[in-house]
A protein has these predicted regions:
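Conserved mixed alpha/beta catalytic, RNA-binding, or beta-rich assembly cores of soluble enzyme
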Residues: 2-294
Length: 294
């Protein structure tokens, strides 16, 4: 999950620095493998955070720091030890879980997403999509880590900017088509990128992620441009969900606003062995979600 930004290479003097927004959209800075800064969360509670490998039930700086440090230890986030492939589902209808399933079903043939230490990446395999995205929070900016970039390449991925690790989902989508992929999905975290991708690549599957705090105008743009929208703690996206074709989950629902988005959610349901409830209902259907919505 990534917010559009540009990276600067270490060769140009930048330190090993990575900025993410995690656990209530708290700004966290990681330098040289250590948590250097922890900001203030935008919300007070989230049901997803209580299901993390290291659960966070109270959004304090200490708890958030401990969770991020656990990610660094467990899978090398923002370090040269970063694991980039995985086959486990971490949540039922997460963006990476849905897109990995869509790859297996043949609905798409590549995913454009962002990875700490690499920036924008084109991933053609379910394991690479899940390994990069399954435990990644909102990536604001990153710097290149050669070991991570080489690991992604060895796993069949393509790194858009290996020298700078910039995050540019619009350019990444174009690069995916240039590489010969024809059914491209892309994750976007800002409305401007969603609008630009839709204008340049009408057939791309757009997945809106990291949406907490979107303005009303931004939310309207996401709904009009994206095929799939993860609502996070966005009040405006929930208000606009009545036009969706399908909803997955209730606490942090994911909405499909197009037939392509609906098919991706249904593909995930088809391959899952978990029991499901299917019901015709006016959307959205609310559950116990993040607090407060913003």
């Amino acid at each position: 999950m990534a917010r559009r930004d540009s990276g600067t290479s270490k060769e140009e003097g930048r330190r090993d620095e990575h900025v993410i927004e995690a656990i209530g959209r708290t700004r966290v800075v990681i330098r040289d493998g250590r948590v250097a800064e922890v900001g203030t969360p935008c919300i007070a509670d989230c049901p997803l955070a209580r299901k993390f490998a290291m659960p966070v039930s109270e959004f304090t700086p200490e708890a958030i720091r401990a969770n991020i440090e656990n990610r660094i230890r467990s899978f090398g986030m923002c370090t040269g030890r970063r694991e980039v492939t995985d086959t486990r589902d971490f949540v039922g209808f997460g963006a990476s879980e849905l897109l990995s399933s869509a790859l297996r079903a043949g609905l798409i043939d590549a995913v454009v997403l962002a990875c700490d230490g690499a920036g924008t990446v084109i991933a053609p395999t379910p394991a690479l999509v899940q390994g990069i995205g399954g435990r990644m929070s909102g990536l604001v900016s990153t710097s290149p880590i050669p070991e991570v970039i080489e690991r992604i390449k060895a796993s069949g991925g393509y790194v858009l900017d290996p020298d700078g690790a910039s995050i540019d989902q619009v350019r990444g989508t174009g690069a995916a088509y240039d590489l010969g992929y024809r059914q491209v999905a892309v994750t976007v975290a800002d409305a401007a990128s969603a609008r630009e991708v839709r204008a340049l690549h009408p057939d791309a599957v757009i997945v809106a992620v990291h949406t907490t705090g979107l303005s009303r105008d931004e939310a309207e743009t996401m709904v009009s441009c994206a095929d799939l929208v993860t609502t996070c703690a966005s009040r405006h996206l929930r208000d606009l969900a009545g036009s969706a074709l399908i909803q997955a989950g209730t606490g942090i629902p994911v909405f499909g606003f197009t037939r392509a988005g609906k098919e991706i959610i249904l593909a995930k349901v088809r391959e899952s062995k978990a029991p499901v409830v299917v019901k015709f209902e006016r959307l959205p259907v609310a559950g116990t979600g993040p607090e407060p919505l913003v």
